[in-house]
């Protein structure tokens, strides 16, 4: 019968820690739990896939811990959307694929074989760019993939020092012709 209520928007600026803290606060958690107690269905929409670096999974776990039935419906992972936008595969044949958050040791990550997908790269952009240059590696960054503000950077030098939270860098080994 349509959307009757909306929940507070948990902004990216607050981060996952803020969202988890809000859900642990009974007055905030109540927004969701009250709806369920009234027999209403609740849906949470997220960008990308709800199981990959998504704040949603914390909501899911709390709702499930309160004894309510939960269901996760997969989405299109952002790195797959990026690959499609670039019109290329992420990996071919027996190549390895590594999905790496920016909180990981970037230098160690770039030593891994195969394709590296650097998620949430904006938080360490100067370090990421410097490390890629130092290692003579190339990569492509898509900022805000699928959104009106989408921008593709094909060269490391083109990538701005400050980029959107929704920035993904793909670093590939070898040719994919």
For each of these PLM feature ranges, what is it?
Residues 1-68, 157-159, 167-168, 172-176:
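Class I S-adenosyl-L-methionine
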Residues 15-19, 81-83, 101, 127, ...:
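Short, charged, surface-exposed secondary-structure boundary motifs
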Residues 18-26, 85-88, 111-115, 153-159:
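Short, surface-exposed amphipathic charged segments that create phosphate/polyanion-binding patches used
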Residues 28-31, 104-108, 127:
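Short acidic active-site motifs
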Residues 30-37, 69, 88-91, 133-138, ...:
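Generic secondary-structure signature for well-ordered alpha-helical cores
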Residues 42, 110-177:
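A contiguous loop/helix-start segment that scaffolds small-molecule binding in enzyme catalytic cores
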Residues 44-46, 72-75, 141-142:
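General beta-strand structural signal in soluble alpha/beta enzymes
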Residues 51-112, 160, 174:
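Class I SAM-dependent methyltransferase SAM-binding "motif I" and its flanking Rossmann-like core
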